[in-house]
Amino acid sequence: MSAPLSLFVTGTDTEIGKTFVSAALLHGFARAGLRAAAMKPVAAGAYERDGAWRNEDADQLDAAANVALPAAIRTPFLLKAPAAPHIVAAREGVALDIGTIVDAHRRACEMADVIVVEGVGGFRVPLADTRDTADLAVALGLPVVLVVGVRLGCISHALLTAEAIAARGLPLAGWVANRIDPAMPFADDNIDTLRAWLEREHRAPLLGALAHMSPPSPDAASHALDVNLLLNALRAAAPR
């Protein structure tokens, strides 16, 4: 059996569709015949149901995955308040330890063929005084998929994020254009610009451009993503 594949999903900002795209990728991987699991290592914002604390993003990932990870592996750190993780963690007396997440990821890799790891917020969200989500991606050593929320300002946000990813020595396996503003003028032109710049500067292909959906359907969106292109990039980036 080949070694499991894994990727780190980040975004140009918060609330731009990382969970939606991650769930769509999970559907695509499952359709490709892979055992697909998801991690949301740090989740901020919880609700209680049946005596257990849950998170809506994690619920969406669970619904899309065809391999269910134990909650403690899927989300090692579930914070109650929906705010910046390092602030909430400090108030709740929780240390967001990257080593704990790396260990959970190692265990997840024993259970599935491909693991989608969804970050929190953008690429550089503080987890502690001196560590952020970029440090987490480096510790995991994973190729990155960038979700670009297509709205005014997205070109600069995407290029800056791609630079930050490259500066940490991580491969940008591809990016997804997610149309979060259905009224945005020249959306296709923005996507075309990013396609050219990210390909030229980072050799990062566009994996798909997702139409605005209301309500969102990750399963439907998965058909617009080139999962095989991504799988080839992940295999090329995997340790030999």
Curated annotation (Swiss-Prot):
Mg(2+) binds at T19, D57, E118. It comes from Burkholderia pseudomallei (strain K96243). The lineage of its organism: Bacteria, Pseudomonadati, Pseudomonadota, Betaproteobacteria, Burkholderiales. One of its GO terms (cellular component) is cytosol. The keyword ATP-binding applies. This is ATP-dependent dethiobiotin synthetase BioD. It comes from the Bacteria. Homodimer. It is found in: Cytoplasm. Its main location: cytoplasm. Pfam families: AAA_26 (PF13500). InterPro entries: DTB_synth_BioD, P-loop_NTPase. ATP binds at E15, I16, G17, K18, T19, F20, D57, E118, G119, V120, G121, N178, R179. Catalyzes a mechanistically unusual reaction, the ATP-dependent insertion of CO2 between the N7 and N8 nitrogen atoms of 7,8-diaminopelargonic acid (DAPA, also called 7,8-diammoniononanoate) to form a ureido ring. Keywords: ATP-binding, Biotin biosynthesis, Cytoplasm, Ligase, Magnesium, Metal-binding, Nucleotide-binding. Pathway: Cofactor biosynthesis; biotin biosynthesis; biotin from 7,8-diaminononanoate: step 1/2. GO terms for molecular function: ATP binding; dethiobiotin synthase activity; magnesium ion binding. Transmembrane segments: none annotated.
